[in-house]
């Protein structure tokens, strides 16, 4: 559990901020009221100039030199945590950094918990909660598109938007209070209509961002692409062709792939998780049955589907099952029908399959370059460009709840129930505030910041 000291001098924390292991450099970070004091004792210097790199030898309690390092002092509040911070850049490897941390602990620091540096930045008002979430996700970002979205959030664009909406709602709430307190006074006749229009405009904008964010929800974590088809249709060959290496076993024996195989690759500016699934047919044994069940789950969870059919053969009963699955799952996902084995004579003709976006390919002989280009262009359309985005389930839930409150507020205003109208406007304000500055105390924040890496 992340905790903070309630005194005016919170504990000084220390952690390795770079990945543990062999490397040219390692960065050890101190934060807290005694960070400078501890760094001066380690380096045996009488001062460090803020924001200047200082080359110094580091010493232990036995007067043994531990390393030659660079120290950078960030004076509060101009640091990541808004506290006194010292970064120690020492030589890489685990041993040197561990010795430095051990000495700092002996001088009064304690080991930082996961995410505690960012937690302190949040508590000290340097960042809001949406920015803290962006930091955690930015560390894990795997694509240019997710990087751009998260960087905008880190810069505070979501926070500024939320504060703008809150400001508008506060003005509306003021109208409610005036109308309640001065019910007998003559107020402008069109005031209620203007307030209704303003609420509807705010709700419409929030709904647009909410729906757009749901549609693009896979952008940050990576889009999921499922390859489906009957056994022995060429799914594993296609996976290998997309990856440019032999990931899956390719065999003429039907049912070779009995479980889902997941790999990832970059498509243009996007990170995509490709799932090669077990062939759809009547299961021959319990293990194959489990594999087929996982295939159906992968289909339900996918953002895009590549449905593979053998163009050199007429449709089989298993192919008809695939067609039924496509009909059932064509909402909220892109489907591309691939007629494989185009290097052989074409026997398959089916108007329903050809009504989907489709391509003729040969997974063994080539032709996947055009396919990759098409998928990348689809993902570009899905990305949404520079549009503001909610990047966590928590943010989505807050906006969804705020929309519910705004709908109730609008209805109550039209009915003339001003006190209930004010109550629901306050509810919307609270829900939106949770995006950047939650009322909840330790439990929610412990879960959030506990997902960060040590040293962040």
Swiss-Prot record:
Residues at which K(+) binds: 232, 251, 253, 256
One Gene Ontology biological process: tRNA wobble uridine modification
Domain TrmE-type G as annotated: residue spans: 222-380
Cofactors required: K(+)
UniProt KW keywords: Cytoplasm, GTP-binding, Hydrolase, Magnesium, Metal-binding, Nucleotide-binding, Potassium, tRNA processing
Domain of life: Bacteria
Record: residues binding GTP: 232-237, 251-257, 276-279
PROSITE patterns in UniProt: G_TRME (PS51709)
EC category: hydrolase
InterPro entries recorded: G_TrmE, GTP-bd, GTP-bd_TrmE_N, GTPase_MnmE, MnmE_dom2, MnmE_helical, P-loop_NTPase, Small_GTP-bd
EC number(s) per entry: 3.6.-.-
Cysteine disulfide links: none
A GO molecular function held by the record: GTP binding
Free-text remark on how the cofactor is bound: Binds 1 potassium ion per subunit.
A Pfam family that the UniProt record links to this protein: TrmE_N
Chief localisation class: cytoplasm
Subcellular location: Cytoplasm
Family annotation (CDD domains): trmE, TrmE_N
Binding site for Mg(2+): 236, 257
Entry binding sites for (6S)-5-formyl-5,6,7,8-tetrahydrofolate: 29, 87, 126, 456
Family, as annotated: Belongs to the TRAFAC class TrmE-Era-EngA-EngB-Septin-like GTPase superfamily. TrmE GTPase family.
Function per UniProt: Exhibits a very high intrinsic GTPase hydrolysis rate. Involved in the addition of a carboxymethylaminomethyl (cmnm) group at the wobble position (U34) of certain tRNAs, forming tRNA-cmnm(5)s(2)U34.
Assembly and oligomerization: Homodimer. Heterotetramer of two MnmE and two MnmG subunits.
Protein name: tRNA modification GTPase MnmE
Organism: Wolinella succinogenes (strain ATCC 29543 / DSM 1740 / CCUG 13145 / JCM 31913 / LMG 7466 / NCTC 11488 / FDC 602W)
Record lineage: Bacteria, Pseudomonadati, Campylobacterota, Epsilonproteobacteria, Campylobacterales
